[in-house]
Amino acid sequence: TALNERMLLMKDVAAYKMKHHLPIEDFTREQNVFAEAEEEAKNNGLDPHSITPFIRSLMDASKVIQYRYLAQWRTGSEPSFPIQTLSVTRQRIRQLDNQMLIIISQRLMVGAFSHEDMVWLRTHFNAPNLNESDISDVLAALSLVRRAR
């Protein structure tokens, strides 16, 4: 899923930040992500205010993954894969975020997310370094997204 693929990219983000000694937290970047997401939400018929908790949960989960990778690499071997530039990875993340907003909007046209939808998403949301609580937080925030009136 786009959601899982987005989380898988956090390994690349963490590796880049480790290599270049950048902090995981980037408040300015987060503000830009919120602004872009709210604009995309409007463009896709979603209530931009309802998308905020979902985007926050994605960013929180993304940071959790990055911190956990950094902890693993600091106590073991460092990344041994080619490290993408942050701009390339962020471009892909932005594409996935936009794809998710389109999918969410289309799904909400026929009604709210069902229990079955959430069960399906949970089974397909299996990115490394996320625990059940992290996943539950993202899915709970997803359930708050609404279409614009």
State where each predicted segment sits.
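Alpha-helical coiled-coil oligomerization motifs
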Residues: 14, 21, 66, 70, ...
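Glycine-rich, aromatic-bearing surface loops/beta-hairpins
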Residues: 106-149
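Generic structural signal for hydrophobic core residues of well-folded globular domains
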Residues: 16-17, 58, 62, 104-107
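Charge-rich, acidic-biased intrinsically disordered regions
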Residues: 21-40, 78-88, 113-127
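Mid-length scaffold segments of soluble, non-membrane domains
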Residues: 44-80
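N-terminal Sec/ER secretory leader and immediately downstream segment
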Residues: 1-52, 57
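Extended amphipathic alpha-helical interaction segments
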Residues: 73-110
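Generic structural signal for well-ordered, non-transmembrane alpha-helical segments
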Residues: 4-7, 31, 35, 56-59, ...
